[in-house]
Amino acid sequence: MRLDRFTSKFQIAISDAQSLALGRDHQYIEPVHLMVALLDQNGSPIRPLLTMLNVDVMQLRSKLGEMLDRLPKVSGIGGDVQLSSALGSLFNLCDKVAQKRQDAYISSEIYLLAAIEDKGPLGHLLKEFGLTEKKVSEAIEKIRGGQKVNDPNAEELRQALEKFTIDLTERAEQGKLDPVIGRDDEIRRTIQVLQRRTKNNPVIIGEPGVGKTAIVEGLAQRIINNEVPEGLRGRRVLSLDMGALVAGAKYRGEFEERLKSVLNELAKEEGNIILFIDELHTMVGAGKGEGSMDAGNMLKPALARGELHCVGATTLDEYRQYIEKDPALERRFQKVLVDEPTVEDTIAILRGLKERYELHHHVEITDPAIVAAASLSHRYISDRQLPDKAIDLIDEAASSIRMQIDSKPEALDKLERKIIQLKIEQQALSNEHDEASEKRLAILNEELQEKERDYAELEEVWKAEKAALSGTQHIKAALEQARMDLEVARRAGDLNRMSELQYGRIPELEKQLDLAAQAEMQEMTLLRNKVTDAEIAEVLSKQTGIPVSKMLEAEKEKLLRMEDVLHKRVIGQKEAVEVVANAIRRSRAGLSDPNRPIGSFLFLGPTGVGKTELCKTLANFLFDSEDAMVRVDMSEFMEKHSVARLVGAPPGYVGYEEGGYLTEAVRRKPYSVILLDEVEKAHPDVFNILLQVLDDGRLTDGQGRTVDFRNTVVIMTSNLGSSRIQENFARLDYQGIKEQVMDVVSKHFRPEFLNRVDESVVFHPLGQEHIKSIASIQLARLRQRLAERDYQLEVDDEALDLIAHVGFDPVYGARPLKRAIQQNVENPLAKSILAGKFLPGSPILLSVKDGNIFASQ
């Protein structure tokens, strides 16, 4: 018998049967070995056939196992296993049956048919399970769909719909699909296109996360509920699994063969199946090799003739990039555009999904949490779409609450650690026999007993609360199942079952749930089982870094005293500090314009008066780190072409993929302080980019993505008009100086730029008393650096006055002070420390001697 007369699946089964016989020390491969190999084969063609004939496959497999155990064993056969005469004659019978059926190849099911015809032990066993030649022959016809086996891969391609698609209508019947709320217009338009005579193929287009797949799931649910026109009743919606279609297609043409078998089966169904292709663009170019046809071209004839009812789904960008490039494919589809739902629609969607998420996480989701998820995600997450981003917030918040319920509460955990600590101490003291140790041990034993008593009480409360929560969950799960059963009964028209569920089981469960919820409403001391708006805000803050959670008392106090904190580092600039503090307070109190940055300021004034220092202090105040500031040195943007570095290079230029310096920094950290230093040195075209940022709080980068600046503080610094400040400082008040400076500034910057800045702040030149305060701050930093090396620095008033006097320069502000400290304090100190004059741990006193700074112990 030639092996190449068998299909590839059957050949693999024969190899498996040989391995099985060898492993069990059997001398011959018997028909039973091959039958077991066929049943155990991955993607076995025999199993679905037996299931169709109502055979208990597991029981048959165990009976075959018993037959294998009865076969004689021969040790030392050395891998030489041959076909038994029974199997040889069975193969000849298979060949005869295949020829009778006009098959070019012998397939696995022919072996089953031949085994029943055969008079051997395998045939007897199969007949015991109620299998007859007639029954098996009819089942084979049904599975093959009237086709002959003319291809060695015929078995792999058979029942392609079962292998390569997922039945959405079946999943809807089982209640596995989430409910679809709203989207009636889009579903109606999809049904309308499907009802056409030709080109009845809608393609659902929308941004990622707006609910394209949900529309098809909604269609599947409407079909099983008979809420569709007559033409669509009883149809099945199958989702094409592209992964399964491509996976394992090793040889050229194998992918096309699989797709062709799917299309052939769909054609046979005569329009009873609607094929859903998610990510439709993947079909264009799929399977394309040199000189071969891609999947998109294979679909075209079936789509044009109306043989294939297809619903596609893809994003706008991918539709433009792949589908529109192929006009022949594009014209066969009808577009159904899906827009992002409004916040109100999203709230309705979330209310519909609420029960599913409650059941999954075993927590309760409150209505304020749903409203907060929709509104906060809409405001603060700008690069994603509703309802997806709102659902994510609900899901993660519920997950965090569940995690807290499952893990030990913090109070219990702390007590447990304390008990362990006391037990270790008790163990150590029990080995000591002096009076002090015994006294301490007695106190310790008392404390340990008290802690263990507290722990036992708390643990009891925790277990009781957990039990109360799990009780409601079981009732909720039973109620959900009862509602699903009611739907099934309603579709089947089973009125008895419907009345039993609707008027008996469901009201009873609802009553139980109310009672359990009332018991649960007693104040929980350890566990939280409700997702509230506070949890949603917390999750959002973790995701984006934007503080939207309710302020604690400590934070309110901190914001009210913000000026004091800023004044500790920024000396003598009362107006600037007030302006910045007011902007931050407006933002945290929720009063600032949601469509503009938190604040945009132009800091003007001479060099070294604290313009940049105020930005650093603000970043430190908001984020506890100066590094949280996005600093852009505008002197780097003096040429016109350098503007592209801020927002990213346009398409076609080198660096297009990298994104812009400013836009990428803000995308990563939407809540930040942006410092545009020395802004007057930049090219005038840079200010055209800033207009959008200052007015609408948004900027489009080189790749067309909109970057949200609404949660940033934009601060620009400039030295313009500093000469006017120096000239008029003595004779004019603050308002007069500001007018003089703004006169110079308005000549340099365009009116539309200045008009968009919230506040232009003029900084005062620093006086002698300011420099002295700054000297104290700078010496405190030096003291901190020395303390890290175990030296204690002390400075007397005389030395401080001298440093302030040497470092004072009305033109250059506080910067000369830094140099004065370096030259008069740091340099001599460094020499003395290296020479070993001061030892670690010793105090260093700075005083004045002969008009110079002198360091002594």
Curated annotation (Swiss-Prot):
Repeat in keyword set = yes
Q: Where is this region: Repeat 1?
A: 6-71
For this chain's UniProt record, which GO biological process terms are given? cellular response to heat; protein refolding
Q: Where is this region: Linker?
A: 341-545
What terms describe the molecular function in GO for this protein? ATP binding; ATP hydrolysis activity
Under the heading InterPro entries, the entry gives: AAA+_ATPase, ATPase_AAA_core, Chaperonin_ClpB, Clp_ATPase_C, Clp_N_dom_sf, Clp_R_dom, ClpA/B, ClpA/B_CS1
Any idea which positions bind ATP 1? G206, E207, P208, G209, V210, G211, K212, T213
Q: What start-end ranges are recorded for coiled-coil regions in this protein?
A: 391-525
* Top-level lineage group: Bacteria
- The segment(s) forming the Clp R domain are 3-146
| Pfam families listed in its UniProt record | AAA, AAA_2, AAA_lid_9, Clp_N, ClpB_D2-small
Q: Where does ATP 2 bind?
A: G605, P606, T607, G608, V609, G610, K611, T612
Give the region (C-terminal) as residue ranges: 766-857
Q: Where is this region: Repeat 2?
A: 83-146
NBD1: region residues: 159-340
Q: What is its main location?
A: cytoplasm
Listed under GO cellular component are: cytoplasm
Subcellular localization, as worded in the UniProt entry: Cytoplasm
Q: In the UniProt record, does the keyword Zinc occur?
A: no
Subunit composition and interactions: Homohexamer. The oligomerization is ATP-dependent.
Q: Which NCBIfam families does its entry note?
A: chaperone_ClpB (TIGR03346), PRK10865.1 (NF008118)
Q: What does the UniProt function comment say about this protein?
A: Part of a stress-induced multi-chaperone system, it is involved in the recovery of the cell from heat-induced damage, in cooperation with DnaK, DnaJ and GrpE. Acts before DnaK, in the processing of protein aggregates. Protein binding stimulates the ATPase activity; ATP hydrolysis unfolds the denatured protein aggregates, which probably helps expose new hydrophobic binding sites on the surface of ClpB-bound aggregates, contributing to the solubilization and refolding of denatured protein aggregates by DnaK.
Comment on protein domains: The Clp repeat (R) domain probably functions as a substrate-discriminating domain, recruiting aggregated proteins to the ClpB hexamer and/or stabilizing bound proteins. The NBD2 domain is responsible for oligomerization, whereas the NBD1 domain stabilizes the hexamer probably in an ATP-dependent manner. The movement of the coiled-coil domain is essential for ClpB ability to rescue proteins from an aggregated state, probably by pulling apart large aggregated proteins, which are bound between the coiled-coils motifs of adjacent ClpB subunits in the functional hexamer.
Q: What is this protein called?
A: Chaperone protein ClpB
Source organism of this protein record:
Vibrio cholerae serotype O1 (strain ATCC 39315 / El Tor Inaba N16961)
